A protein has these predicted regions:
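Short glycine/proline-rich turn/loop motifs
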Residues: 49-50, 250-260, 315-323
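Amphipathic alpha-helical segments that form well-ordered structural scaffolds
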Residues: 67-74, 275, 279, 339-340
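Short, glycine/acidic-rich beta->alpha junctions
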Residues: 64, 95-96, 268, 272, ...
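Intrinsically disordered, low-complexity Ser/Thr/Pro/Gly-rich regulatory segments
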Residues: 1-216
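Active-site-proximal loop/hinge segments that shape catalytic or ion-binding/gating pockets
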Residues: 215-262, 266, 270, 284, ...
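Short helix-terminating capping/connector loops at secondary-structure junctions
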Residues: 147-154, 284-286, 347-349
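Basic- and aromatic-enriched surface patches that contact anionic nucleotides/nucleic acids
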Residues: 287-298, 304-371
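Glycine/proline-rich, flexible active-site/cofactor-binding loop segments
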Residues: 60, 80, 258-312
Length: 371
């Protein structure tokens, strides 16, 4: 049977996050237990009158798993596993058949499963055919199990490793199974991103995992003004931050790379982001528009002109149908203002002004960013 009691809401995972974020295991025991604890690998850290605090290194694999779990926790997913004993049934006919899940992270639209593998020394020979094929065989079943309890979602299985050099055959197998692969650099990248951006990092992760995929049920139709400027067509509109966050991105590359963190830190400055988040949560607002470039996906954007127009005006009013795809809106200017709404109580009730161009090339994007 699935161990649903070990799948908790984000607000109920505070104590687990404190344990996972520590580099070592710690506990307080009585003095009479100290000798046995030392024999078991624990090291005395602080002695008191009747008790003593001891610590020891986490077991191989646990530290990496905790690092991955903590990164996803910082991103603010709605549900996560509270321990590594969480299991999901993969057989509707025999619920007793289960698969242990190292990390599960879920929100209202997506569900991510992560399997973590770590070794203490670099291993260039390990083959993962059996492990990957076993997961692929269980994958539909565990997705169906989640769907039966939480409804339809977008799923992604992530195979995360540390100190393993994955061969091309296994990388091809991961791609063919529509899985994702994170090496230690990818994990460091997303952990750093979560530390830097907080809950806003989730949208960059999901955008990378599901780039170009439709977000079903997302209403992206907005009242808009169509205008002309510099030989380009643009649209001016207002939209809820919660909607734009789901389709927006700030870096063109999809591959997670720890070397990209300085670029993120330049584009989105943590002190400024924090200040804007506090300003927004206090009821503050920004009247100036975000500037974005919409990726049309090779299709002309639908703009339904209103029946009533102003005569002799270049502008037109109507309803703009924005793409409902991950990574379909590149943020040229206004990153802090947008991501400042992430996790805010106003992210679904406020509207922010936007000026949107369509399929701008990089040179044109640079021209917009410094104006």
């Amino acid at each position: 049977m699935s161990t649903w009691n070990l799948l908790l809401k984000h607000e109920d995972l505070g104590e687990e996050s404190k344990r996972r974020i520590k580099a070592t295991l710690n506990k307080t025991i009585s003095l009479k237990e100290l000798e046995l604890a030392v024999a078991d690998g624990w090291v005395e850290k602080k002695r008191r009158k009747r008790t003593v605090t001891v610590e020891k290194s986490k077991a191989l694999g646990d530290s990496f798993e905790d690092e991955v779990w903590t990164a996803f926790y910082r991103m603010g997913f709605d549900y996560m596993n509270s321990t590594n004993k969480f299991e999901l049934s993969y057989s509707s006919s025999n619920p007793a058949l289960t698969k242990q899940i190292d990390v599960i992270a879920m929100d209202d639209e997506t569900c991510l499963f992560v399997e973590c593998k770590e070794t203490d020394k670099l291993d260039r020979t390990k083959q993962w055919k059996t492990d990957l094929e076993a997961m692929y065989g269980h994958y539909k079943g565990i997705c169906d199990e989640i769907t039966s309890k939480f409804g339809r979602k977008k799923f992604k299985y992530i195979f995360a490793t540390r100190n393993y050099a994955i061969g091309q055959t296994d990388l091809d197998r991961i791609r063919d199974f529509n899985f994702a692969f994170f090496d230690e650099d990818s994990v460091k990248y997303y952990d750093g991103l979560a530390t830097h951006l907080g809950t806003a990092a989730k949208y960059q992760l999901l955008g990378s995992l599901f780039a170009g995929k439709e977000i079903k049920g997302l209403d992206m139709n907005v009242p808009a003004i169509e205008g002309k400027m510099g030989g380009l067509t643009y649209y001016s509109f207002s939209i809820e931050p919660s909607k734009l966050l789901k389709v927006a991105y700030v870096l063109h590359r999809n591959n997670a790379n720890h070397d990209l963190m300085p670029t993120y830190q330049r584009l989105i400055q943590k002190p400024r982001l924090k200040a804007i988040q506090e300003f927004v949560n206090q009821g503050g607002y920004f009247p100036n528009s975000l500037i974005i470039s919409i990726d049309s996906g090779g299709h002309q954007l639908q703009f339904d002109k209103a029946n009533t127009q102003v005569e002799d005006s270049v502008s037109r009013v109507g309803v703009l149908h924005l793409p409902r795809r991950y990574q379909s809106a590149y943020i040229i200017d206004g990153q802090h203002r947008l991501y400042g709404y992430s996790g805010s109580r106003f992210e679904s009730t406020n509207c922010i002004p936007v000026v949107a161009f369509v399929d701008l090339n990089k040179e044109a994007q640079l021209n917009c960013s410094w104006i």
